[in-house]
């Protein structure tokens, strides 16, 4: 069967890439209100393509409310021949990032170009290419098995607002949770370690964003008349931020680590097996110095498996040319916290407010604003039946051992696992060098075909693992 799947995919690769290029011409930028019609065109294109592939049910689901409308998601369903077969839900997104700065693109971002085995266009890797390989994988499985229905019931939920923070996705999941009910969730919106080092992601960190606004005098004051005698909001803000970490790089919020689960020796060994070149990694950050962070952990462990606090921006007072001798009336900072399994964004928001309240000097008022409910982390144990099935499928497609990674970023995956109460499996073939969110986004065309192979094998592996597919993802 493996040979038949690979042969079908090779034979139909041209058709696959022609369809993908057509989809990539649609500028479905969810963050730009002027592109709302294009996001809708993108949803319609995908629904039509899935219907053409053979999915008997394809629907476009509106999101938001009448007063606060969102952008559409696409739902599709293909029942298994065996009604007792497990149900697999595939998640991805059809919206894309903005393209600025345009002058840094080597070709127009919505005019796909092939170059050296790469397909260049906005959305090629994140996430249209990785969504579409599932349709090719399904066609390959059916052809290789002479079947008219998949071995598992397949459902897809492809959202249209991921790149603008998924503001309506959790509500959509709750509204449609019965139709989206599943035994396993497959996420194809992450990356592998390298083209020649295939890997599976097993978790993503959560995040909350906050702003601290510090207020002092009613107006800017002359520093010669008042400096050193009245509270300075910038001084107060600097003191708060300087106390955010202790001498070992640990976040100083009381209770911040109470629910953090330490890495096991086995997990640390999995990370250590990755061919990580710290010097080269620092080079990609434009930093010729040394890595830093929480003491006692490697760089990989810090960015994947440890919670963090970062100062994202600071401003206040005079920032124009020349001098201006004032005590400013206000100062501001933006912060973000990356969270790991079992940390609740609401709890951390409360810890931040307590931290600030305890350290605010007299004569200063501070307002802490948290941006939305935050995003919980998502994590699937390496030895879980669903992840094991994904590993076997990838190893069949790539013909080599699969390593395990995590990702330091955040997405709506935790909502999927928590609301639908199903384990997550991350099956993706993107690479860090795909330049997602940046000019000249690209995807390795051969890896997309490997993704299609993996998808075809995954349905068999999950069907075989059906008795063990229980239990929600940790978050």
Show the residue positions of the predicted features.
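N-terminal capping segment at the start of a domain
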Residues: 2-6, 10-41
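A non-catalytic alpha/beta surface segment that caps or lines the substrate-entry region
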Residues: 29-84, 110-112, 393
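Active-site metal-coordination/substrate-binding segment of hydrolases
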Residues: 84-158, 450
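A common structural junction motif
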Residues: 95, 244-248, 353-363
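A generic structural motif
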Residues: 125, 218, 337-345
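Histidine/acidic-residue-rich, glycine-tolerant segments that coordinate divalent metal ions
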Residues: 151-232
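Polar, glycine-rich mid-to-C-terminal structural blocks
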Residues: 217-220, 224, 229-281
